[in-house]
Design a protein with these regions (language model features):
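Fe-S-dependent hydro-lyases/dehydratases of central metabolism
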Residues: 1-208
Length: 208
């Protein structure tokens, strides 16, 4: 698993086990493939997403979305309580369906977790199976360590944490909504999100 803010800061997932999560995300250009959808479905079959946790899943392409429909994977996701979205590669980018808020802790299959990349909260990176397992448990874990009963966390504590984070956001210096620079037109299909909007600019502008 990669710890928040630094995708290269990887540790054994056991070191982060039991970290409470508020949301989980499976998708992006790196982990929204058919094999990723199947891995998540295998974990979620006959299980439910933990109370207080939101699991969002975004397949990479329409072809994968339709294959999920054909294989009954979407039904598995829906029965588990998943928010299953239209296809796209930008689900893990701030402003998209995978975005998190101030004080929120997310475990994600995105390719980056720089500050601001997926919203204003903290983002851990993990495999699709581990993300699905964590969504069921309510905390970071692996598919072979899912509890029979999800963790029960204090809603008041969670609400207070969000409130404190939101108040801190209000005291931060306002960031510009617009930036100026040169525009490059690249007529290629294999463009990644860093080429579209580089991660070093994610904290320069306000994603909202």
């Amino acid at each position: 698993v990669s710890r928040p803010g630094k995708p290269h800061d990887t540790v054994d997932i056991k070191e982060e086990t039991k970290v409470k999560i508020d949301s989980a995300f499976i998708g992006s250009c790196t982990n929204g493939r058919m094999e990723d959808m199947r891995a998540a479905a295998n974990v979620l079959k006959d299980r439910k997403v933990a109370p207080g946790v939101v699991l969002k899943i975004v397949p990479t392409t329409d072809e994968i979305w339709l294959q999920c429909l054909e294989e009954g994977i979407i039904k598995t996701f829906k029965q588990a309580g998943v928010l299953f979205s239209n296809a796209g590669c930008a689900g893990c980018a701030a402003g998209q369906v995978g975005q998190n808020g101030p004080g929120e802790v997310t475990i994600s299959t995105g390719n980056r977790n720089f500050p601001g990349k997926q919203g204003k909260g903290l983002v851990y990176l993990a495999s699709p199976a581990s993300v699905a397992a964590s969504a069921v448990a309510g905390y970071i874990t692996t598919e072979d360590n899912i509890p029979d009963v999800p963790a029960n966390f204090d809603f008041q504590e969670q609400a207070q944490r969000f409130e404190i984070a939101i108040e801190k956001e209000k005291t931060k210096e306002e960031k510009p909504f617009e930036i100026e620079g040169r525009v490059w037109l690249i007529m290629e299909d294999n463009i990644d999100t860093d080429m579209i909007y580089h991660n070093r600019y994610l904290q320069i502008t306000d994603p909202n």
